[in-house]
Amino acid sequence: MTTEAAVLDYKVADISLAEWGRKEIEIAEKEMPGLMATRKKYEGKKPLAGARIAGSLHMTIQTAVLIETLVELGADVRWASCNIFSTQDHAAAAIAAAGVPVFAWKGETLDEYWWCTRQILEFEGGLGPNLIVDDGGDATLMIHFGYKIENDPSMLDKTPGNAEEKALLQQLKAVFAEDNQRWHKVAAGMKGVSEETTTGVHRLYQMMEKGELLFPAINVNDSVTKSKFDNLYGCRESLADGIKRATDVMIAGKVVVVLGYGDVGKGCAHSMRSYGARVIVTEIDPICALQAAMEGFEVTTMEEAVKEGNIFVTATGNKDVITLDHIKQMRDEAIVCNIGHFDNEIQVDALNNFKGATRINIKPQVDKYVFENGNCIYLLAEGRLVNLGCATGHPSFVMSNSFTNQTLAQIELWQNDYKVGVYRLPKKLDEEVARLHLGQIGAKLTTLTKEQADYIGVPVEGPYKPEHYRY
């Protein structure tokens, strides 16, 4: 049950959880040195003064520290989660109680989710945002889809391809009825978007290639201090947390199939092996497949692995990588989960519509499917992000890397006039983000002498690597 305040502009599960949320935010601040150093650096300067930021990113305790950093730097912020299960209700309550409009609660319906996304794009006085912090690209998608509809209203009559599209169209119909040029006005006022995750970045590049991108974007995901830390080390800890909270299963001795061996898949595979599992990897990319094999993982196809796995983890960013046919072949009591951004990596709709299986809810975000032969599988978080649906996501320290990049990207977009395109933060800023986190873990940097720097052709203070360097 959600509560909506008559006076304050927010919608959360339970505002009385705010004190609990505030206590956890204070703990997280101590583990997020990058964000706290950024606050200190810009103290009194308000580099985001006048910015209206719409945030569509998991409403967690760590995100609360990001939100309050943006506010402290002068921004007017509205926030929603980018996933129906990822909100931590005490975090949302604490931010709402602090006066920031937030629209998020754990367990939203798809209709509620897109309603929440619409709310963050509507600022006081009928204004739209001029900046977006996005994770997965849904806020950006809503503006672009709405813009297309205003150019071709017949799109409102199209048959939705799925429940998600139906919910989005419902919101866009309501907006169109109120103002049939709303999204043109919003797009015209946009300075840009900073995108957090691989899936959202993929969407941005696709729009750019088609000539459809309406405003500049900064690809935060491919900053080294995001992709090689959040995606790798974050997943290495939070995947196991999600699986264990959901099932209490012993991982040691199990066969775990990890689908995809990008940065996220690498973190997952190493995590499961560290618990004593035998890990099998599936891959389409020969380079990633060779990396997995050289790390000692068995690399094969899903058609082979499906017969062996006890636990399946999708980490591809693609659709239909675990099909209904795969699920029907799995061993009894197999656990199936996803750690990619969207829920279409596993054919959940096909499973739910399959008459040969009975769905039994065990507890929130854990469902048992019993097949006619007596075998069963357990699906976690309805095929959505298992680490956020069944646990609390990545630890604060690694999220400080990602969110410091997000903050710097927002300042960069606000203070400069970028042409439409997809950009990355410069190497110098990437190195600075890493530098801000070293002291917290007791690491000490060696300093080049002038002669050494000249010898390898880099400045004493960096950057130390060329843009094409692969860490």
UniProtKB/Swiss-Prot annotation:
EC numbers for this chain: 3.13.2.1
GO CC entries: cytosol
Keyword entries, A-Z: Cytoplasm, Hydrolase, NAD, One-carbon metabolism
Any GO BP annotation: one-carbon metabolic process
Main location: cytoplasm
Entry annotated with the keyword Metal-binding: no
Family to which the UniProt record says this protein belongs: Belongs to the adenosylhomocysteinase family.
HAMAP family the record matches: AdoHcyase
Protein name (record): Adenosylhomocysteinase
Species annotation: Chlorobaculum tepidum (strain ATCC 49652 / DSM 12025 / NBRC 103806 / TLS) (Chlorobium tepidum)
Upper classification of the organism: Bacteria, Pseudomonadati, Chlorobiota, Chlorobiia, Chlorobiales
Gene: ahcY
